[in-house]
Amino acid sequence: MRLFYRYQDLAPQLVPLDYTTSPKVKVPYELIGSMPELKDNPFRQRIAQVFSQDGDGHMTLENFLDMFSVMSEMAPRDLKAYYAFKIYDFNNDNYICAWDLEQTVTRLTRGELSAEEVTLVCEKVLDEADGDQDGRLSLEDFQNMILRAPDFLSTFHIRI
C-alpha cells in the first residue's frame, strides 16, 4: 500500500485513490525522475525507460511496482543482474558493447574521466568479462562478472 500512495503522491491529479476501475494512468517520466529515490541516480532515465511499458519512461502503477520490487534489497541476484544488464544496454540490442560501456562509465564517473580514460576502462572490462571474446558482453558474460562483484547486491537498490 505504501508504494501505491508513493505513486499517487507523484501525480495526485492523475492517479485516483480508487483503482477499482483499473485506469490506464501513466505518471510522466519528469515526475518519476524527480523522485528523491532517483533524482541523483545517473541512470534514472534508463531505469525509467527499462521499467516503463513503452520504453518512454512514463510508468503505470504496475511498472512502478515492478521497478521497486526489482530494486529492493530482497530481490534475487539473478533478477537484479538481468535488469542491470538491460539498464546498461543503452542501444537495446541485448548485448553490452563498447559504446554501452562508454555510456555507463561516463555516467558512473559523472563525466570526470577523459575520453582516453573511459576507453581504457571499457577495454579492461571487455578483456576481463567477455567470455567468448566477441567484443561485447552477453547477459551470461555480465552475470558471470556480477558474481565476482560482492557489493553488487548492496549497491543495486532503491530505498523507499
Curated annotation (Swiss-Prot):
Function: Acts as an auxiliary subunit of the sensory mechanoelectrical transduction (MET) channel in hair cells. Plays a role in regulating hair cell MET channel localization and function.
PANTHER family: CALCIUM AND INTEGRIN BINDING FAMILY MEMBER 2 (PTHR45791), CALCIUM AND INTEGRIN-BINDING FAMILY MEMBER 3 (PTHR45791:SF7)
Tissue: Expressed in heart, liver and inner ear. In the inner ear, expressed in vestibule and basilar membrane cells. Expressed in megakaryocytes and endothelial cells.
Binding site for Ca(2+) 1: 89, 91, 93, 95, 100
Superkingdom of this protein's organism: Eukaryota
Organism field: Mus musculus
InterPro entries in alphabetical order: CIBP, EF-hand-dom_pair, EF_Hand_1_Ca_BS, EF_hand_dom
The protein, known as: Calcium and integrin-binding family member 3
Molecular function terms from GO: calcium ion binding; magnesium ion binding
Family annotation (SUPFAM superfamilies): EF-hand (SSF47473)
Key words of the record: Calcium, Magnesium, Metal-binding, Repeat
EF-hand domain location: 39-74, 76-111, 117-152
Subunit structure: Monomer and homodimer. Interacts with ITGA2B (via C-terminus cytoplasmic tail region); the interaction is stabilized/increased in a calcium and magnesium-dependent manner. Interacts with TMC1.
Positions contributing to Ca(2+) 2 binding: 130, 132, 134, 136, 141
Other notes: The binding of either calcium or magnesium significantly increases the structural stability of the protein in comparison to apo-CIB (calcium- and magnesium-free form).
Underlying gene: Cib3
